[in-house]
């Protein structure tokens, strides 16, 4: 059983999974490592680590600035893998998921899956993964038991959803609104309806992210999903 499978096995009506999102290297690699350690100590169930990218198209102003600050520190993919290795040495159970854009993952070419495995990474989320490359990308990752976590949006139709599920593992990330991160979420009923539909088609857990700005929203989203994604407070504070 993988680390992700183990953590989601603990899910119940009263216990939902907290996924925390932190951009690696903002404000520095050393601070990122401390933030991630603190998040685990504070109860984070899954660490989602953002890979800095020059054009993070799905992100709102707060996370875009976090990417910019990290890139100014000349953060490279190998640096992020080193952070993962350090976390894994200290904690053997917390799942680590890298979230980024295709070009970042392609930097390791055919060594990607092996390097992720050696760093103790459990899964990846590729925001701009081309559909025609998803099957081979998924199969390569699975050779090292790395999960490919797919982003499902409000505009994903039934046909496309079923196709995506064929190359998905670990869990599914439902993007609760159209647009960029940080926008305000208003239509809870629509999100609930979509999550329910997704869960009827797969055994994979579904977490909800985007638009979750406070405890009230998080609680509401968790009531019909397996967990929620929360952005590290550090990025929000740095943007003020």
Q: Which residue ranges define each predicted feature?
A:
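Glycine-rich, proline-tolerant flexible connector loops at the mouths of alpha/beta enzymes
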Residues: 48-75, 178-183
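Active-site beta->alpha loop and helix N-cap motifs at the rims of alpha/beta catalytic domains
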Residues: 67-125
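Catalytic cores of alpha/beta
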Residues: 32-37, 159-162, 212-225
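Glycine/Thr-rich beta-alpha phosphate-binding loop at enzyme active sites
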Residues: 63, 73, 161-200
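N-terminal amphipathic alpha-helix/helix-capping segment at the start of soluble metabolic enzymes
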Residues: 1-19
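Active-site-adjacent beta->alpha loops and helix N-cap segments on the catalytic face
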Residues: 2, 58-60, 77-81, 128-141, ...
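Conserved small/polar residues in nucleotide/adenosyl-binding loops
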Residues: 234-240
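Catalytic beta/alpha-barrel core
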Residues: 122-133, 148-155
């Amino acid at each position: 059983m993988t680390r992700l499978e183990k953590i989601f096995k603990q899910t119940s009506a009263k216990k939902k999974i907290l996924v925390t999102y932190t951009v690696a290297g903002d404000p520095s690699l050393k601070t990122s490592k401390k933030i991630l350690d603190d998040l685990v100590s504070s109860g984070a169930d899954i660490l989602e680590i953002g890979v800095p990218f020059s054009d993070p198209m799905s992100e709102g102003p707060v996370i875009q600035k976090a990417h910019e600050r990290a890139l100014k520190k000349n953060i490279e993919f190998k640096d992020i893998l080193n952070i993962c290795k350090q976390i894994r040495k200290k904690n053997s159970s917390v799942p680590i998921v890298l979230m980024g854009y295709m070009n970042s993952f392609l930097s390791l070419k055919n060594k990607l899956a092996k390097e992720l495995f050696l760093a103790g990474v459990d899964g990846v989320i590729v925001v701009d993964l081309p559909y025609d490359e998803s099957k081979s990308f998924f199969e390569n990752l699975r050779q090292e038991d790395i999960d490919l976590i797919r982003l499902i949006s409000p505009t994903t139709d039934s046909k496309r959803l079923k196709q995506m599920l064929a190359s998905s593992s670990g869990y599914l990330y439902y993007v609760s609104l159209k647009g960029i991160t940080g926008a305000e979420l208003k239509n809870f009923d629509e999100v609930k309806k979509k999550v329910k539909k997704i869960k009827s088609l797969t055994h994979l857990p579904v977490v909800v992210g985007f638009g979750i700005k406070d405890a009230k929203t998080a609680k509401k989203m968790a009531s019909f999903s397996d967990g929620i994604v929360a952005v590290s407070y550090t990025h929000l504070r740095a943007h003020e």
